[in-house]
Design a protein with these regions (language model features):
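Gly/Pro-rich hinge or "lid" segments in bacterial periplasmic/extracellular proteins
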Residues: 132, 140-142, 150-151, 157-236, ...
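Append "and occasionally in soluble cytosolic enzymes with long acidic Gly/Pro-rich linkers
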Residues: 218, 313-439
Length: 449
């Protein structure tokens, strides 16, 4: 079986190095090629990968991972290059924590959780280029909270009780790498490795890569989990510059799946006899959340402070108008026209990212703190607008009175930047602009695209 998917050209891969990259667009590729300690199931719960089982002590400060003994590294041709052991995770962690090697990328999770990790990172930073000569043995000698008690057992010691550490250890900061590969490529060479010279331990290897065009994967013939999963004979990702052409490609059988935008869905549903009505299905939410972040020190294009915006956004009542009054259903419909409010997420993380030791999903705990724990999707009203039914008349008056008194003029203009020459991005932004108009009134806040 072959499968053809797609990705936007603005999300082309920039780095093949799993330890170095911090881009989700890179990890969409490399997670098909590299395996770490754990993976996640379709519900966001941690499941075995290279680690077949794991446990922790009573206060969740010490975590033990037992590894499989049948994992090999292969090259781009699927030829076995080395056997994977616990040492490879030590080498990988030292690479991440070494400022001379990984240039501070992906350090936050180990630095925040592991004993001695932040100190070791600082040591390598202070050493400058000389730190490139350090090895995983130097990391262990420095007291970083990790040890390989044998070839297939890893033990991590956290600075504090960390009941969610298994989800942390699943992140790229803790991925393995073979010391032999780093020796073969050198520090600079490994940091800049690509699909032709990197080693793989995941389900696929790369058959072909043409930047901004296509990338094709074929099964890794020596994948340790081959008997446990189903794989495509070839999996191809086509890069598309404008999402408006995906439906045409799907109709031409040049794509096997596509995201159906609002306009395309309207076209399909307008014809009850359309064959595509039977092919519609709701897409599973991704683990990534999307937020609006306020800039509290915005500058104008000439570099001078945008005092009008900066004063406005510093006002509590002004900000609360966004929280309690911005109605986004029509904007969500650009992603999910049938059930737009399923796109609502009122938390920093997405549901399913992590669970505590009692099996409670993290965002449910946040919902309780925010007073949302009794609320549920109803398909009619955004959860955060239910308390006041989106009525911000009093807040708006308060904000305008307080801000007028300190010289703010109205409407306040909020800048919203999009990708140039991308018609889909422009259409989405235009709908968002109308949401601002409907929610705030153009006498109060105007969205500038």
């Amino acid at each position: 079986k072959e499968f053809i998917s797609w990705e936007g050209t603005n999300r082309e891969l920039e780095s093949w190095n799993m330890l170095y990259s911090q881009m989700a667009s890179d990890m969409n590729v490399t997670t098909n090629l590299w395996e770490g300690l754990l993976s996640f199931d379709c519900y966001g719960k941690a499941v075995p990968s290279v680690a077949k089982e794991w446990s922790h002590n009573e206060d969740s400060s010490v975590w033990t991972f037992n590894l499989r003994d049948d994992v090999d590294w292969v090259d781009v041709n699927g030829e076995v290059k080395a056997h994977l052991t616990s040492k490879d995770f030590l080498v990988g962690l030292e690479w991440v924590l070494n400022a001379a090697k990984n240039q501070a990328n992906n350090t936050s999770m180990p630095n925040e959780t592991l004993v001695g990790a932040a100190d070791y990172y600082q040591k390598t930073s202070d050493m400058g280029d000389a730190a490139a000569d350090l090895t995983y043995e130097d990391m262990l000698a420095a007291g970083v909270g990790v040890e390989a008690t044998d070839d297939y057992t890893l033990v991590f010691t956290c600075k504090n009780p960390c009941p969610y550490f298994d989800t942390v250890a699943a992140y790229t900061s803790f991925y393995p790498v073979s010391e032999d590969l780093i020796t073969e490529l050198g520090i600079e060479g490994f940091r800049a490795c690509d699909y032709t010279n990197m080693w793989y331990n995941g389900p696929y290897v790369v058959e072909e890569f043409i930047s901004q065009n296509t990338k094709s994967y074929i099964p890794n013939p020596n994948y340790f989990g081959a008997d446990d999963v189903s794989r495509f004979d070839r999996f191809t990702v086509t890069m598309i510059s404008d999402g408006t052409v995906t439906f045409q490609l799907y109709q031409n059988r040049e794509l096997d799946e596509m995201d159906v935008g609002e306009s395309t869905l309207t076209t399909i549903q307008a014809d009850p006899n359309s064959e595509y009505n039977q092919q519609l299905c709701e897409k599973r939410p991704k683990k990534f959340s999307y937020q609006m972040h306020f800039n509290y020190q915005k500058n104008n294009e000439d570099g001078t402070p945008d005092d009008n915006w900066n004063k406005a956004i510093a006002n509590t009542a002004f900000r609360q108008c966004f929280y309690k009054g911005l109605e986004l259903t029509n904007w969500y419909a650009r992603t999910n026209k049938i059930n737009p409010l399923k796109c609502e997420n009122d938390y920093y993380t997405m549901p399913g990212v992590c669970y505590n030791t009692q099996g409670q999903e993290y965002s449910t705990l946040v919902a309780k703190e925010m007073g949302f724990d009794k609320e549920a999707y109803d398909g009619k009203t955004m959860i955060r607008l239910r308390a006041n039914n989106g009525d911000i008349a009093d807040l708006k008056k308060q904000a305008m009175d307080e801000l007028s008194a300190i010289g703010v003029t109205f409407p306040v203009h909020a800048a919203y930047y999009i990708i140039a020459a991308n018609s889909t991005a422009l259409d989405n932004a235009t709908v968002l602009k109308q949401c601002f108009t409907d929610s705030f009134g153009d006498d109060f806040i105007v969205l500038d695209i």
